[in-house]
Amino acid sequence: MAATVYRPATAPIADAPCEGLVCLELEDGSAYQGYSFGAPKSIAGELVFQTGMVGYPESVTDPSYRGQILVITFPLVGNYGVPSRETVDDLLKDLPAHFESNQIHIAGLVTASYAGEDFSHFLATSSLGTWLKEQGIPAMYGVDTRALTKRIREKGSMLGRMLLQKEDLAVSAPSLGVPGDWKPHFETIEWVNPNEKNLVAEVSIKEPKLYKPDEATALKHPSGRNLRILCLDVGMKYNQLRCFIKRGVEVLVCPWDYDFSKEEYDGLFISNGPGDPKVMDTTVEHISAALQKNNTPIFGICLGHQLLARAAGAKTVKLKFGNRGHNIPCTSMVTGKCHITSQNHGYAVDATTLPTGWQELFINANDGSNEGIMHVDRPHFSVQFHPESTPGPRDTEFLFDVFIQTVAKCTTDNTLLQKGVEFPGGTTEENERLHPRVDVKKVLVLGSGGLSIGQAGEFDYSGSQAIKALKEEGIYTVLINPNIATIQTSKGLADKVYFLPVNAEFVRKVIKYEQPDAIYCTFGGQTALSVGIQLKDEFEALGVKVLGTPIDTIITTEDRELFARSMESIGEKCAKSASASSVEEALNAVKDIGYPVIVRAAYALGGLGSGFANNEAELVDLCNKALAASPQVLVERSMKGWKEIEYEVVRDAQDNCITVCNMENFDPLGIHTGDSIVVAPSQTLSDEDYNMLRTTAVNVIRHLGVVGECNIQYALNPFSREYCIIEVNARLSRSSALASKATGYPLAFIAAKLGLGIPLKEIKNTVTKVTCACFEPSLDYVVVKMPRWDLKKFTRVSTQLGSSMKSVGEVMSIGRTFEEAIQKAIRAIDFHNLGFSESKGALMSVDDELQTPSDQRLFAIANAMHAGYTVDRIWELTKIDKWFLSKLKGLSNFAKDMTKLTANDVVGRPDLLLRAKQLGFCDRQLANFWDSNELAIRRMRLEAGITPFVKQIDTVAAEFPAFTNYLYLTYNASEHDVSFEDRGVMVLGSGVYRIGSSVEFDWCSVRAIRTLRESGFKTIMVNYNPETVSTDYDEADKLYFENINLETVLDVYQMEDATGVLGAMGGQTPNNIALPLLRAGVRVLGTSPEMIDTAENRYKFSRMLDRIGVDQPTWKELTSFDEAKAFCQKVSYPVLVRPSYVLSGAAMNTVYSEADLESYLQQAADVSPEHPVVITKYIENAKEIEMDAVAKDGKVVGHFISEHVENAGVHSGDATLILPPQDLEQTTIQRIEEATRKIGAALNVTGPFNIQFIAKDNDIKVIECNVRASRSFPFVSKVMGVDLIEMATKAIMGLPFVEYPAIDRPSGGVGVKVPQFSFSRLSGADPVLGVEMASTGEVASFGVDKYEAYLKALMSTGFKVPKKNILLSIGSYKDKKEMLPSVAKLSQMGYKLFATAGTADFLQEHDIPVQFLEVLAKEDDQKSEYSLTQHLANNMIDLYINLPSNNRYRRPANYISKGYQTRRMAVDYQIPLVTNVKNAKILVEAIARYRDMEIGERDYQTSHTPLQLSGQVNFTLQDSLSRPHSFKKAHVLSVEQYTRADLHLLFTVAEEMRLSVQRGNVMDILKGRMLATLFYEPSTRTSASFEAAMKRLGGEVISIATQHSSVQKGETLQDTLRTLACYADAIVLRHPDETCVDVAKKYSPVPVVNAGNGSREHPTQAFLDLFTVREELGTVQGLTFTFVGDLRYGRPVHSLVYLLRHYSGVKVQLVSPKGLELPTDVRQQLVKAGQLLCESETLTPEILGKTDVLYCTRVQKERFPSEAEYEKVKGSYRIDNQTLKHAKSKMAIMHPLPRNEEIAEEVDFDQRAAYFRQMRYGLYCRMALLALVMSG
């Protein structure tokens, strides 16, 4: 079998000259091709891999790598260039400062990708390639280094050779490599095994040389000379020398074979080095002699350790593939502590051969191999790892101190030479005694409550992990978390869940009630921490132990002053700052801090009054402004433009520390890290930068005493190594959720275990199952996190980003290159983003946008690059690191080049397509460049064999096998990591959290996955949101951390050969691609996507509701302002304006007047230009009701009804829900259930669905129906104790389940769900409720009645029950009247009431005591006792009830009203605010009833259970077939017979037919009936579809072949018809003569259906064409039809044109060759109807751009008098992807078929191509026609 050859796995560097290919051949015959970037020569050596993520300059100069070909597993190499070779070391004087020796020692370098000349670091003087060429070292990139690592891991270290491409043999497309027989193209050389040589002799010093320390620090011998270490150089790294010299000893470095017995020295050190210790007999003899003499202490490292062991008499062994990395855990046998070490070796000491007197000092925590030895009673020891690091962590550098101290002591006290070395850190026994396991039986975990900005789904993930960890340890867990939408509050996780506020009062109550032993405050974000801080002094008295990080540590990290002092005490620095209350004080403060500074007004919200000052003048100016707004200013050192770097650090109770992940913000300091793009691991830090910050992080966490996990953020000056600590979060944070997902290391799970006192080294790594958790993950991919903002939902919120967080969600993407990862992330944020390319959106000026970043920043960079800005110019404006900008510039340039090509240019260039995919461009983006469409590009790609590879995330960069299936897709690879045998069910997750789609859908996805797994199905999860539980690697059998779009889902589906795709659980994101998936041949599980489309397209849905007799509010679609105006006058204001297909009411608005209408239309039309705007009559004061249901095959099998507290008009996502409903009348409930049954049946739902109703005076109307799981599913499932998602999943998969199961909850009792808003985070947003959704989360609680439940739920959102003062401002008279009894109640309860002018008058008239407050301007301060603003600002008000009148549920207009100002003040000063009258009433009643709340079980509760649904839907086929209508027993000869009502009936029946066929129902409507088909012209489709239609209806068919019939004998048509009428009940006739219809009408006794009379008409084709348009586009009205081709003889066109006259707003464009125009009488028909828009002989882009339906016809040879005339026009029009680039993205391409050349085959793959679906619609239509004509 031929060995495998792999083509290059990544794209070549753009704009760099190609240096030729290199082929890396392995001993086993496999060959990897890549691009050369080092010296142009071939070499051979031993292949080894190294898993460190930084430190390539140090690694390649490490003598231990002599003769080896080094494979770096981290894919991005060369990012920070190479520092100067000339700079000399301060300590070592004549040696280079930045390297480990004076030359590169590796034989060759292999990497996945390479930065080229786009490196970025202040010390860099050249690229890595330049340096390698200087030194004559070959290098290659473009290799799938992960695949290579796995090969070495499985086979062991092997020989390899890097072979250069021969100069004279050029390769046409280097990126495709040289397939097949590659050898002739490359040079050949012999294999070389470096281990057979004496490598040490090559790298050791040639003559002894003495290095002296600085006299000031020199350590002295008792005799007065310097202490001297003799170093045996067997390949020493310079850093070992640096470690000695800086500690004040002099070092005599001697060659490897030097006999040092005559030298005078105080300690012997044996260095590291390359090769096999077996060949070093001379050195071993010399060391042996020193051991015998025992004159001095001895210390060895790496090879030195092996040589010392051999000298003592032990043996060494070759390891399979060596340990080469920076993350290897070694446990000390003395102290029991585990250290993270840097290693590089292929041999180890065999500990079983150690002679008497020697013992193991360190062992490898992963595989138990030896890592160090020591003599029991002599000062000799050695270690296998590198305590001097470089590259790698510096955690064991203390061993140099141990050695030097031992040497110093032995020079003063000889007897110590008879004792072993003393190591610091105590003994294992002492350490275990000091930090025992915490013994607890019951633990209380605090959750984070409702999701808000800054505290979102990541706490569901981390809390769930923590509970999992506690359960694994057998501990009983109690959780307090009112967030009912989360997985952690589901059954089966915590033993007990309290849906109560996470505040001090309720936590105290729960502790008293439950009496837990311990509490965790670190898994619930800031909410839980604050409670811990408030209760810290009570915990002991309550008998509760705080687990994990001590509360005092948390207080230190939360308080800036304390934290700064604490850091100062260990010599670390924070950002310098000082407060000042005058300009003079500020000027003094600056003397210490230094310019530039940032000035902020203290106590001002949202960064008001802050700015940067570079000099005194600017400072004075800023201070004057800030002091006007605030009594105090904070002056801080400005680090604008510094890099922001984060580390996640973990520490256990025994003081073992690791850093799990480091992250670099793409945006420099100044933007909140939650609003920054974050890249992990860091890309532009060198080894020294990385480990300087890592060491600091470890020191800080140790000093603070954190136990568990903590996050530390730094600012790093990009032009020096100056850094300062910004903050430490001593709890699980957003970053830690990201780090867990980025690395696969389950931080929260581990942190929960550490809090119990379990040490890290005793916890297994769940991914590899063989290594321990005390290690630092190695990544061989790059991760990009990107925030998602929804600022458009709020008026008056600035989109500028700064130090306060505004994003509501985030996405994470994974790739093998930065380009691939960032493009994926951009697409994940929003469906409309295609990737990094210029966007036409309305941005402010590019320069402003770059300087003052907003949520549009990345697009501004793309636009700037497109406009020709250089990287340097953009860097000046943004200070984003040039490395990132260069990568983006590469994408921008590539995109520019691609737009010059078309799809045809690319067809023969698979290398271009491959390169585009490797750079992360998606098919949609390429289609955009090449004027094609997504599916055509996909087809081209599949034909070229270009598909993504699946890679695993395993925490160890492939060093060990992984047992998880945590996967991502990449094109930068050459093989898959996994096999595809499962055929699992794909579940699509929720995607990015945003307003309207949040953690509820994650709950639904996870419940679906768990149900599938419990039922024995293999599962595949697809999601890209790092905050979710569904992206936890142990939830599904396979997790693809990938985007949910058509391309990716199809790729995964086809690779996995999945059983089906379940999209109903993830909210709107998966629903949007359901129909395209179905059309691409995917098995979509659950309700048919065509039915989903029926529910989401308002025309189809509305027609369906009319058909089944369910009411809906009056609405109309809108194309012009005048139409809209007329409609609004007809139905009367108010009305609701909204675009179709939106999530959570984007740009929906209630409109109260014509002026409003005009301004809103503009706004709504912008939202989604492809979908028209719709106006609906808005019903005031109606109740809104939510129905959540599950159906199977259209039959409802379970449902729950919840009622909204607020009236309709508040978005359902912002409404307060009550379950079971308390105020609904039985008749209303019955009507709702009846309507639900009808809708479920009409849509043939299988799975979950949700309907929103409004009810007024018992009349119900449907607002909308979502055929998917909805936001309220978790709430209703948990309140009622029936998991609707489990039921829905079983229904979808055809598993058995119980319909309407018994409800599992205490009798009585009410659940209330309340929205959680984040207005306080969004400076400027108006906190009123409207039709646009504004809440970011939800909470729920239970109570005896709705009042108790509501109050608890409200308190869960942070609401504080008022103590004394309540302020009222009520707008409308109606609200004043409605509120009066409630206000009276407040007064009776003893509250002091304040009110604004109108409200105060009204209340005084009704004898309610109230104090009047006025909204005063700033200058009227003297009247402060009447000033409302003063009362709010001084926190004198405990509750503000502000019921605005004019805005009536809509976002306010642009003037700033006083009401808005006071509402905003309430939010800014954290005063509870109520803005809805219904909320205000229920709140007052709740306060009156429940001043004090006790907790306990709910023993008694409400009285009625949901009604069982029964009975059938009343509308049936029989019903419409039995009514009188025009088709019954009648001929169907011409379309002119029919009215719009007839068509409506026909299509309604066709819909029913379609449902029946899809359900697989057997129909017998025409059983016993007979149809004859009589075709005098050829026909496949028409005859076959009539035959199929008849048979599906249960009838029989006689088909007459006219060429074999009596016609041949001269029988007339009338005789044939009469004859057939004797046998059949109806006849389908096609005849070349136009007059045949008259004959039929005159002579046939049974109905005749015209299937084409000459070139005149084809009615049934026209019917099915119209039906197709309705189904594809929702409606026929208002569409533009373009007919192309032979219009003269195209009979379907003639019929269709006649039918179009029934529809308003239709326009027609005619395109035909000369001589084939539409017949005059048909054309007249169009002119008369006013429908003719234009006529043309060419299909121009303008015509195409207006087209909604493109109807093509065949130029028919049989219609022409001569062959010549036919040939002249036959190829006039051809529709292909190139033509379609001008077409709308939502339109339909139709053709009556068969086709010749009119439509290219490539178009078949376009979603818009409807012609094959047209045939299917034709079947339903003809079934309907036959049923109507022949039944009854």
From Swiss-Prot:
Mg(2+) 1 binds at residues 713, 727. Its EC number is 6.3.5.5, 3.5.1.2, 6.3.4.16, 2.1.3.2. Keywords: ATP-binding, Cytoplasm, Glutamine amidotransferase, Hydrolase, Ligase, Manganese, Metal-binding, Multifunctional enzyme, Nucleotide-binding, Nucleus, Pyrimidine biosynthesis, Repeat, Transferase. Residues 443-1484 are annotated as: CPSase (Carbamoyl phosphate synthase). Mn(2+) 3 binds at residues 1252, 1264. The DHOase domain is defective. The third step of the de novo pyrimidine pathway, dihydroorotase (DHOase) is encoded by the pyr-6 gene which is both physically and genetically independent of the pyr-3 gene. This is Multifunctional protein pyr-3. It comes from Neurospora crassa (strain ATCC 24698 / 74-OR23-1A / CBS 708.71 / DSM 1257 / FGSC 987). The lineage of its organism: Eukaryota, Fungi, Dikarya, Ascomycota, Pezizomycotina.
